[in-house]
């Protein structure tokens, strides 16, 4: 008979006692353990490191969570995902918990986080700077986050955790009846001129230290939106809105758009807003009243989401009225998630009253987001899946290490029943292929000239 030193009640008491503090780890401070061991095992009791231990054998790795057994793990799911499993036919395949920290974010990002740990602070305007007053230099500035604002600051600084990314994306819009009403192919590009850890010059791109990121999205199919493109240029000052430029093929010119209209879909049928990106799609201080409202274990898709068996990395679907509403998804027991709420403070016409984001305490990665309408009712949800891109003997490389990134996303409108599904694929029409830390992404995708070129191609 195996003796259990720390049961679920011990963990619950710890999380309740922690209250509004964000410092992670149950048995020991998490990032002290990570710096020493490279994994998280010594920071958590066994019962938080396996679904078998947590459910006392009622659910095991390899099992599927369905409407028949979801009540056993209801407390481990955000409310919208629970309802999707309980009522809409969503299924979740359980896999073992990942404890190696290097498999949960890009390798160099974790190295930079460890190397630069303890050097970040906020300046008088609340922007993240180094101890000597310069823009941030790379990695998560607050791995030992002690507050909600530190968690969100780290995520806002670096969405994809690479210096540059180009994501080839396929997107489907699903009606409440389960019908695929729209299908899009697009490209999403990001580049950081500060906090660079891979692309020279680093950590800063000279002359652009006043910018946080360049980000664009353009559409390749269908013909009704082909050539439509948008470019966001983010100031480093997180009180300022990005500059938003767009190219609309019908007008054959670049125009500048109001940048505070971030709660509207860019294309017909979509439930995805600019504000949703990485659960931190707006400048940090356009939201406020950040607060930690909960913490505890969670089931989330932080590994195994890459479909290496498909030549274009495309994923299978299930559930809903026609079996097309949800991506097939693998989830694992995340030993500790920190739940943060925030309210929009610089959006006079925002349709949301607040958002709630679940962060993986190990990496400060956003696991899920639920927003609430002005009445306080559940409105929309956003949940993603991540992976190290190695599976079944196949690997997609990022320099010396396997690529780490998101793999697929659900964006669901709980009030209308509409679903937007996105997946990162190998390539889309026009020869645009997923790439990482490629310095040419700026000239190809992140200038107004690039938008015009893409729009007329």
What are these model-derived regions, one by one?
Residues 113, 117, 186-208, 215-221, ...:
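Extended beta-strand-rich segments in extracellular/periplasmic secretory proteins, especially
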Residues 291, 297, 396-449, 454:
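Cysteine/selenocysteine-centered motifs that mediate thiol-based redox chemistry or coordinate metal-sulfur cofactors
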Residues 230-231, 236-303:
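Acidic, serine/threonine- and glycine-rich low-complexity intrinsically disordered segments
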Residues 38-241:
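Solvent-exposed N-terminal domain segments of exported/luminal and surface proteins
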Residues 1-14, 21-29, 36-37:
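N-terminal secretory signal peptides
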Residues 224-225, 237-238, 332, 347-351, ...:
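Short glycine/serine/proline-enriched coil/turn segments at secondary-structure junctions
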Residues 348-424:
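C-terminal soluble interaction/assembly domains
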Residues 218-222, 245-249, 343-345, 372, ...:
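A generic structural motif
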């Amino acid at each position: 008979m195996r003796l259990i030193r720390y049961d679920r009640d011990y963990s619950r008491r710890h999380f309740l006692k922690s209250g509004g503090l964000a410092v992670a780890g149950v048995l020991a401070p998490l990032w002290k353990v990570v710096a020493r061991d490279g994994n998280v095992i010594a920071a958590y009791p066994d019962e938080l490191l396996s679904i078998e231990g947590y459910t006392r054998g009622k659910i095991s790795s390899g099992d599927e969570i369905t409407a028949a057994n979801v009540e056993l793990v209801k407390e481990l799911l955000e409310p919208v995902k629970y309802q999707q499993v309980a009522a809409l036919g969503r299924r979740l395949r359980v896999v073992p918990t990942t404890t190696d920290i290097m498999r949960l974010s890009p390798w160099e990002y974790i190295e930079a986080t460890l190397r630069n740990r303890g050097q970040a602070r906020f300046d008088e305007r609340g922007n993240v700077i180094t101890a000597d007053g310069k823009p941030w230099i790379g990695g998560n500035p607050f791995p030992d986050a002690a507050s909600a604002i530190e968690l969100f600051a780290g995520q806002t600084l670096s969405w994809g955790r690479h210096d540059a990314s180009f994501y080839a994306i396929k997107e489907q819009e699903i009606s409440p009846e389960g019908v695929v009403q729209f299908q899009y192919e697009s490209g999403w590009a990001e580049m950081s001129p500060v906090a660079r850890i891979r692309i020279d010059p680093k950590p800063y791109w000279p002359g652009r230290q006043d910018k946080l990121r360049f980000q664009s999205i353009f559409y390749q199919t269908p013909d009704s939106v082909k050539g439509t493109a948008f470019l966001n240029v983010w100031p480093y000052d997180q009180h300022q809105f990005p500059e938003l430029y767009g190219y609309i093929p019908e007008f054959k010119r670049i125009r500048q758009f109001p940048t505070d209209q971030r709660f509207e879909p860019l294309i017909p049928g979509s439930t995805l807003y600019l504000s949703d990106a990485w659960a931190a799609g707006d400048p940090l201080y356009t939201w406020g009243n950040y607060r930690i409202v909960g913490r505890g274990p969670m089931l989330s898709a932080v590994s195994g989401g890459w479909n290496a068996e498909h030549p274009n990395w495309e994923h299978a679907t299930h559930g809903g009225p026609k079996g097309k509403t949800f991506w097939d998804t693998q989830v694992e027991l995340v030993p500790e998630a920190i739940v943060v709420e925030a309210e929009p403070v610089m959006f006079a016409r925002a349709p949301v009253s607040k958002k709630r984001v679940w962060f993986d305490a190990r990496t400060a990665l956003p696991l899920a987001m639920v927003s609430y309408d002005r009445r306080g009712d559940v409105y929309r949800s956003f949940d993603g899946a991540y992976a190290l891109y190695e599976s079944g003997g196949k690997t997609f490389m990022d320099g010396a290490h396997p690529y780490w990134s998101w793999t697929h996303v659900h964006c669901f409108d709980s009030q209308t029943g509409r679903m937007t599904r996105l997946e990162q694929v190998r390539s889309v029409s026009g020869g645009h292929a997923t790439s990482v830390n490629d310095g040419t992404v700026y000239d190809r995708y992140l200038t107004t000239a690039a938008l015009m070129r893409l729009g007329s191609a």
